[in-house]
Amino acid sequence: MSEEMVPGSQFKSLVEQDMQDCYLRYSMSVIVARALPDARDGFKPVHRRVMYSMHKLGVVPNKGTVKSARIVGDVIGKYHPHGDVAVYDTLARMAQDFSLRYPLVFGQGNFGSIDGDSPAAMRYTEAKMNNLGALMLEDLEKETVDMGPNYDESLEEPLVLPSALPNMIVNGTSGIAVGMATNMAPHNLREVGAAIHALAENPDLTGEDLMEYVKGPDFPTGAIVCGRSGIREAYLTGHGRVRVRARTEIETDAKGKPRIIVTEIPYMVNKAELCKKIADLVRDKRIDGITDIRDESSRDIRIVIELRRDAVGEVVLNNLFKYTQLQTTFSIYNLALVNNLPKLLTLKDLLQVYIDHRLDVITRATQFDLKKAAARLHIIEGLRIATQNIDEVVKIIRQSKTTEIAKQSLQDRFSLDEIQSQAIVDMRLAQLVGLNIEKLEAEYNELIATVADLKDILEKRERRVAIMLQKLDAVVDKYGDERRTTIGEAIDDSDDEDLIAEEEQVITLSKEGYIRRLPIDTFKAQNRGGKGIIGAGLKDEDNVEQIFTASTHSYLLVFTNKGRVYWTKVYRLPEGARNGKGRPIVNFVALTEGEKVQAIVPVRKFGGYFCLVFATKKGIINKMDLTLFSRPRKAGVNAISLDEDDELVKVQLVGMSAEEYEASKNASDDDSAEAVENAAEAQAAEAAIAEESESGDAEDFANRPIPKDLLMIATKNGQAVTFPISCFRAMGRGTHGVKGITLAEGDEVISLLWLKAGNKILTITEKGYGKRSEPGSYRVTRRGSKGVRNLNVTDKIGAAVFVESVADDYDLIITSKDGQVIRIKAADIRLTGRNAQGVKAITLRDGDVVKDATALPSVEDIEQDSADAKETFDKVKGVEVDDDSVVKDDAEKQEIGPTETEE
């Protein structure tokens, strides 16, 4: 029997699609069911299952400990069918007072140490829940949380715990998923309790307000957090970095020799490795002045570093901070599951999620109590009827031949239901006769009041809030303690920028969203040909999207397709190696779902005669003074207001003369006046055309000087409109803009160009054709007109996919949909007239089309652009930048990040 052979390309496509689908399912499984905690209880599934298993086993605070192996076996067998090592590590970590600010498990035996010692084997250690751990499961039996089936659907397990303790915030967490990670700092219970109190009573409080209550992280190992800027950024944006220093003291011994005493070390630092590192640095003579190091720790940490008599303690200590983990950077990234989806959470978000969860738990517990009280009240009402008619009830029961007949007779006679009649017949006759009427009435009245009270709780949110806060106060009063970590001043009270030399950098952004920076000197030795430094390190299917120069002190304005703008500093970007691809830009700006970077504008100073010009897909343009963007916000702001079906295409930073700048600011909004002005410009341009045409020097006409303030909007279907920047007024940030071009049906804007002297207009089509045209051949027209033809679009060449102003020595990279890539010189594409179709720039396979293209400047152009920008901005008197909402990251040698892994 013959089999149909699947073509190789089709088989490859099927395999690729199947692998993508499988990996996506695996990724979501890791994210949702393994690596990220639920924002409500702060637990990953393995933590939750360990706690629930201990609850079901009865390994509770008022009972004795049991072997850890028994707990681990129960967890694996019933709820978590993975390796025992991951489960035991989780159990052990919840018992370590140097890992958790508020441990949830009481461990008996060797559960590891801050020196990196592993816990003893699970057959030797014993454990049970402590009182704080029991709080996590309080009211679980009252149906306060949703339950779900275990892995084989033989049992049920909670999908979240009631969490009377705000575990997520006070204990923090860490974890590495697929493509994302979380690392949350622990906090002080008293401070968190006060913040929850304040937010529950006043939901309008801002993150700034809440920082009055939560001062900063409170690590179990104490130490000192240097500066509040990183804390502020983390609390307001969900991610930030804090510098943590060991608590040290310089003292003099009895012989007059100085020594350094370390009493607290940064969180998650291995003490034994720290001492070894110091010893290695002394041996390698990288640190001078140390004669001995001793670890005298017992229950508390005490590291003694003996110094030479002539050593300066402060200098030695500063070197230790510089080269060892006596100083670290803790990276905060508050990523957790909200409604089963990963979300980056600010301080207010963390507190609000917990408040909402606790209110839901209290609501469900109240509903459970109400249901139980109502059921009991229903029975008591039946018994009251029985006591009021005791003789008749006894008579009915005695005369009935069976229990069912007696029940039915009671129901018919006294209008009882099945439950009430069953309660009466279940009582012995002697009990019924001797029923204490007063006791029954007292219980009845009490139940009436209880039911009314429970209903009132369900109806009034303020009562549920009061109950939540009352329970929280009890927890804080009993288990709250003093802060261990001190929040100190920033080191030297200097900005990171003051510690970073101002150097020229080349920044590249790839089409896949990877960004990096390289010193401009890196490019000076670049040889011609090949992929070059600019593209080195990128994947074959990735290419450079944008390349520009900037100072390490420059701001980058990152604009997205949704019209938002984000700020970051150049020095925060990774300084990549020649063959490095950089890091995803989402690590530096908090892009929302569906956002894509459309343009990055480097700004050295917010001042001078500079404007930002925006163009959208639907032909809207806007112009804004650069100084409007001098108040950076890490969370981003709306730069331009977009229609529902529109998106931002391009942003250009445009410099103008003082006269042009003032004309731009004062341009009239009167459409008719504007039309007259534009018509006059067009007429003057046409007169110039006629005059030059009469001279017969067409080449001179095409190469005539171009005014430096001209903009061009290019569309997919080959139209282009060219107009002066000054013909429309600058607007405020967040405004909609005005019509830049009238689009035909089905057409859209693909590019915005600032025409530069000496450059040519390069156009690439989807069928692989390209052409270069002189800017002077494009007639200046009225803004908002249909423009002139840039490209004669036909089935042969296809629509335009790329239009840019380029110099002759630019490199052009063209990428097709099927992954074909070609790199050519821009000058290799023939210079033609404006209406020409162009020449074939890339030969495509059948069915393939050009996906995109990128124009890369030469090394000389990069260096010249850098020099020009520096010269221009050096003359600018910049406005003061409000950096209050952008906290500068620490340029540190090390970051403390996620380390915990679970199977």
UniProtKB/Swiss-Prot annotation:
The lineage of its organism: Bacteria, Pseudomonadati, Fibrobacterota, Fibrobacteria, Fibrobacterales. The gene is gyrA. Residues 881-895 have a biased composition (Basic and acidic residues). Pfam families: DNA_gyraseA_C, DNA_topoisoIV. It comes from Fibrobacter succinogenes (strain ATCC 19169 / S85). Its main location: cytoplasm. It is an enzyme of class 5 (isomerase). GO terms for cellular component: chromosome; cytoplasm; DNA topoisomerase type II (double strand cut, ATP-hydrolyzing) complex. Residues 881-903 are annotated as: Disordered. One of its GO terms (molecular function) is DNA negative supercoiling activity. SUPFAM superfamilies: GyrA/ParC C-terminal domain-like (SSF101904), Type II DNA topoisomerase (SSF56719). This is DNA gyrase subunit A. InterPro entries: GyrA, GyrA/parC_rep, Gyrase/topoIV_suA_C, Topo_IIA-like_dom_sf, Topo_IIA_A/C_ab, Topo_IIA_A_a_sf, Topo_IIA_dom_A, Type_II_DNA_Topoisomerases.
